[in-house]
Amino acid sequence: MAAFTANAVDMRPPVITIHPRSKDIFSQFSLDDKLQKQYAQGIEALKEEARSMLMAAKSAKVMILIDTLERLGLGYHFEKEIEEKLEAIYKKEDGDDYDLFTTALRFRLLRQHQRRVPCSVFDKFMNKEGKFEEEPLISDVEGLLSLYDAAYLQIHGEHILQEALIFTTHHLTRIEPQLDDHSPLKLKLNRALEFPFYREIPIIYAHFYISVYERDDSRDEVLLKMAKLSYNFLQNLYKKELSQLSRWWNKLELIPNLPYIRDSVAGAYLWAVALYFEPQYSDVRMAIAKLIQIAAAVDDTYDNYATIREAQLLTEALERLNVHEIDTLPDYMKIVYRFVMSWSEDFERDATIKEQMLATPYFKAEMKKLGRAYNQELKWVMERQLPSFEEYMKNSEITSGVYIMFTVISPYLNSATQKNIDWLLSQPRLASSTAIVMRCCNDLGSNQRESKGGEVMTSLDCYMKQHGASKQETISKFKLIIEDEWKNLNEEWAATTCLPKVMVEIFRNYARIAGFCYKNNGDAYTSPKIVQQCFDALFVNPLRI
């Protein structure tokens, strides 16, 4: 601490504006068990019809059906059947005679499901100059959109897919104004141009796609009704979980004593649903939402209130995670520390009950790292030091929450094995790329808010200083970084077969929620009103059956 001036160690950081809490409409929610049972029975009755359709479908038709099921949010009902069908397509069908639409659909579905498919399948649509043949492709809107969707699963070195993205973006943008405003095709096209389908949050996209599918003259009424029933079933489950979380949060009474911390259970839970939306992951969602609230309380204590001297005390207490450390802390920090200790004990109890005790020491280790990383950020800010971009990003790998999130969910997924933990400790590219996407999206979205008055640094500030770049140049660079890291994610998604698929999914979904929440300079966690329409759709307004 000797490196800091006397004034700096006792100064409080500039407080970032915390948006007022959204109205609590969930704590008093009571699940209608009779209605939920009706939804469940309706889903089961239709599931057999849908399964029969899936098992009977062949070749191109089965791929279209799988894509429809997944877009409608129904894929989890048929995981085994979908995998069997795709494996057969992967092994037995080369697709040489497929048109553009079907070739791109096959490529995308197989890559989405962790199968390696060469991009050379698109060579047949290229001319001698290495460009896509404009005729007849530019008049095939469905084919162009299918290729556009597929191009976002590219990895490094796949120049044909980069060319596909340029080609399809140009022609789809040109064609879009010519389409009927209310046609399903235009609605899908507009959405895809705004936000690539592969990077969509599945349950949020399902709400959109159900409304689009309902307009489609070729829709299947069985699938449409099942999608609506399934969505409403999930929504009721989400309301129940949000009710439990709201009561847990209100009972803690942290806000009256710690007014500087974020008060957004709803925002935390939105993240949890985005990471794991399926009904069987209720415990996982609850753990994620609580962890986000805990991490936010600790982060805000460092960012918004603690002096350097006080922050050092908190960091040292977190290093030990022992209740006896509480007497070393200022009164307000004791509240935060009790919160951390209480949940740590709950986590340890759950891990023990589930016979996943291996997760406990690694959770504690990640919590210690998180405290050190938050403390480092505070020191940089208060001493007005701008670290190198690389140093800042390395620290951000920890503050992104990717590593601690993995350790927290592992016991709830019965995956807290030494093999899985060792994989995480090796700092795999899948985790680091996810963290970089998270940080870049975060700072692109919240740079203006956090840099108001020039008080709080972001990674953009570090990059601009180090490279002498303008803000616009830096923003452009960050967008390129995000695209590069997504290529890493796409490659690692297929390559990481040493982990259960459900564990690998957290990284892909983490990157998806980062892009969704922070697009258009928004910060959905700090200010949930930015995604209010999405929030109402997920948690408030049921679909009309």
From Swiss-Prot:
InterPro entries: Isoprenoid_synthase_dom_sf, Terpene_cyclase-like_1_C, Terpene_cyclase_plant_C1, Terpene_synth_N, Terpene_synth_N_sf, Terpene_synthase-like, Terpene_synthase_metal-bd, Terpenoid_cyclase/PrenylTrfase. Keywords: Cytoplasm, Lyase, Magnesium, Metal-binding. Mg(2+) 1 binds at residues 299, 303. Its main location: cytoplasm. Mg(2+) 2 binds at residues 299, 303. GO terms for biological process: diterpenoid biosynthetic process; farnesyl diphosphate metabolic process; sesquiterpene biosynthetic process. Mg(2+) 3 binds at residues 442, 450. It is an enzyme of class 4 (lyase). Pfam families: Terpene_synth, Terpene_synth_C. Belongs to the terpene synthase family. Sesquiterpene synthase involved in gamma-curcumene biosynthesis. This is Gamma-curcumene synthase. It comes from Pogostemon cablin.
